[in-house]
């Protein structure tokens, strides 16, 4: 369909055409070395539960604020993400949202952005990359959970020292949040179990996050963190402005 073609062309424009120049520019700023740690099934399960909790809570906040902004603007609230995926074939959702998107976004936001900013410390790098990851989605309803997931994915990247962890997690999050509902029948026990899994995983994720907050490992970088250095430059300013403009256009 036309919507599917537009979606795929947008992905090609955002990822395939944008990544090579980004890699070329970032070569002048090598990423500092990171400690390598094993990615175990237990660790993946823990991060998955925490991620689902962040997605659900962030989605509730984002959807409420999105509806409020639409009503203030005198418009009928619209969920652009749900409407878009409802119009796409399952094959396009699997290819775009569950494979191509996670790989390219992790290369860009974690591998390039967070990895290079880690010279100012891993925690500031995670915050900045998560902020841009949230803004990049260019809509209010997705910003909060995208920002929260960006923090988790950056932590997984820094903790393991490999992009394999954030890429796999990103694929799982997108598959569970976007594709599973398209695979389920419209009636029966499976949709009920799927819906029930969200609050159950959210409770488990919050417990794991609270219990593990003091065991978090963030390395310091060789350079002092500087808001002026990170944000007060043409590239960062342009990226933030473009994201805000894209978001604002939804309400016109």
Label every model-predicted segment.
Residues 1-26, 192-200:
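Alpha-helical transmembrane segments in multi-pass membrane proteins
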Residues 1-9, 71, 180-189:
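Juxtamembrane/transmembrane-helix boundary motifs at the membrane-water interface
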Residues 2-3, 31-107, 114-118, 250-252:
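Juxtamembrane helix-loop-helix connectors linking adjacent transmembrane helices
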Residues 16-30, 64-68, 202-218:
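Membrane-water interface of transmembrane alpha-helices
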Residues 17-25, 54-69, 156-160, 176, ...:
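Alpha-helical membrane-inserting segments
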Residues 22-43, 129-132, 180:
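Cytoplasmic juxtamembrane interface segments
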Residues 91-251:
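Transmembrane helix-loop-helix hairpins at the membrane interface
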């Amino acid at each position: 369909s036309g919507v599917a073609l537009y979606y795929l062309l947008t992905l090609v424009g955002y990822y395939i055409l944008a990544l090579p120049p980004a890699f070329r520019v970032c070569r002048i700023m090598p990423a500092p070395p990171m400690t390598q740690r094993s990615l175990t099934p237990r660790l993946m399960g823990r991060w998955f539960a925490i991620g689902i909790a962040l997605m659900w809570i962030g989605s509730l906040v984002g959807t409420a604020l999105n509806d409020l902004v639409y009503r203030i603007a005198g418009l009928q609230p619209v969920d652009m993400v749900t409407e878009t995926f409802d119009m796409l074939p399952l094959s396009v959702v699997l290819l775009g949202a569950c494979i191509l998107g996670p790989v390219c976004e992790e290369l860009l936001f974690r591998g390039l952005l967070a990895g290079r900013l880690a010279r100012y410390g891993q925690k500031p790098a995670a915050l900045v990359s998560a902020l841009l990851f949230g803004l990049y989605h260019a809509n209010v309803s997705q910003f909060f959970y995208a920002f929260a997931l960006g923090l988790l994915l950056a932590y997984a990247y820094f903790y393991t020292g490999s992009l394999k962890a954030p890429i796999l997690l990103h694929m799982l999050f997108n598959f569970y949040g976007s594709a599973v509902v398209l695979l389920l029948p419209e009636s029966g026990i499976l949709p009920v179990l799927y819906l029930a899994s969200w609050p159950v995983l959210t409770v488990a994720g919050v417990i794991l996050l609270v219990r593990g907050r003091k065991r978090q490992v963030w390395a310091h970088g060789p350079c002092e963190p500087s808001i002026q250095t990170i944000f007060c430059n043409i590239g960062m300013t342009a990226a933030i402005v473009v994201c805000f403009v894209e978001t604002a256009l939804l309400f016109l």
